Amino acid sequence: AGPSATTGVWFGPRL
């Protein structure tokens, strides 16, 4: 779990 690789936030397509 961590920042999304695309948006830089935790609530992204890549948790």
From Swiss-Prot:
Q: Name one GO molecular function term.
A: neuropeptide hormone activity
Q: In which tissues is it expressed?
A: Both CAPA-pyrokinin and CAPA-pyrokinin(2-15) are expressed in CNS, ring gland and abdominal perisympathetic organs (aPSO) but not in midgut or thoracic perisympathetic organs (tPSO) (at protein level).
Going by the UniProt record, its keywords in alphabetical order are: Amidation, Neuropeptide, Secreted
Instruction: Report the superkingdom from the record.
Output: Eukaryota
Recorded GO CC terms: extracellular region
Q: Where in the cell is it found?
A: Secreted
Gene Ontology biological-process entries: neuropeptide signaling pathway
The protein's predominant localisation is secreted
> Which residues get modified to Leucine amide?
L15
| Keyword Coiled coil set for record | no
Q: Which InterPro entries match?
A: Pyrokinin_CS
Family named by the database record? Belongs to the pyrokinin family.
UniProt function note: Mediates visceral muscle contractile activity (myotropic activity).
Q: What is this protein called?
A: CAPA-Pyrokinin
What organism does the UniProt record list as the source? Delia radicum (Cabbage root fly)
